[in-house]
Regions:
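Binuclear metal-dependent hydrolase catalytic cores
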Residues: 1-72, 78-80, 85-88, 127-134, ...
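Charged helix-capping and loop-helix junction motifs
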Residues: 85, 111-120
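Feature marks short, surface-exposed loop/turn motifs that line or immediately flank catalytic pockets
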Residues: 102-104, 143
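Non-cysteine beta-strand/loop elements that form the S-adenosyl-L-methionine
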Residues: 93-101
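Histidine-centered active-site/metal-ligand motif
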Residues: 55, 98, 112-115, 138
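Histidine-anchored nucleotide/phosphate-binding helix
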Residues: 121-127
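A short acidic, helix-capping loop that chelates divalent metal ions and anchors anionic groups
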Residues: 4, 104-109
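Histidine/acidic-residue-rich catalytic or RNA/ligand-binding cores of hydrolases
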Residues: 107-112, 148-152
Length: 171
């Protein structure tokens, strides 16, 4: 995966190679491959853990933890029992950032592309035992209003909201 990112994304054609800026000895960005359940210490009592996700290409979710609790960011994922189980194993979950890429009118596309739509998100959230703040990512701008209205209708217990610029979540 790192080879693919370097070859196709961070290649000075699509994006700069941030692992060599300002130089290779003091880079802005360091890449570290992580396998599911692997933990990386971030310093000051914080850590990041890779969680299982389900998508058309290999994918993971991440648990970020600090003194004030934990956050899970799913990235692209379909309904996933292993991810739900991993989330339910987090005793101090405060925030869940989860994608909902399509409205229910595109349910079949969501299934085929291994994304969530509001009804699939509702099934996912029904299985979550804790009560984190839920923030929705990956909304399609032309369908965001419809998708959020559908989410509100299905997922009232959590009152999910759209993730937005400027939001600060503290752990």
């Amino acid at each position: 995966t790192l080879r693919i990112l370097r070859s196709h994304i961070f290649n000075w054609l699509v994006w700069p190679d941030f692992s060599s800026i300002p130089d290779r000895h003091n880079p802005f960005l360091c890449f570290q491959e992580m396998r599911v359940d692997e933990v990386a210490k971030l310093g000051r009592g914080r850590f990041m853990k890779a969680l299982p996700a389900l998508h058309t290409v290999p994918a993971v979710a991440y648990q970020l933890s600090g003194e004030g609790g934990s956050l899970v960011f799913s990235g692209d994922t379909a309904y996933s029992e292993p991810l739900i189980a991993a989330i339910n194993d987090i005793p101090d979950l405060r925030y869940l950032l989860v994608e909902t890429a399509f409205p229910d009118a595109l349910h079949d596309l969501a299934l085929a592309s291994r994304h969530l739509c509001p009804s699939l998100l509702a099934l996912f959230l029904e299985r979550i035992k804790s009560n984190p703040e839920v923030w929705i990512t990956h909304l399609k701008p032309s369908r965001a209003r419809t998708t959020l209205e559908e989410i509100a209708g299905y997922c009232g217990r959590f009152s999910p909201k759209a993730l937005h610029n400027g939001l600060e979540l503290t752990l």
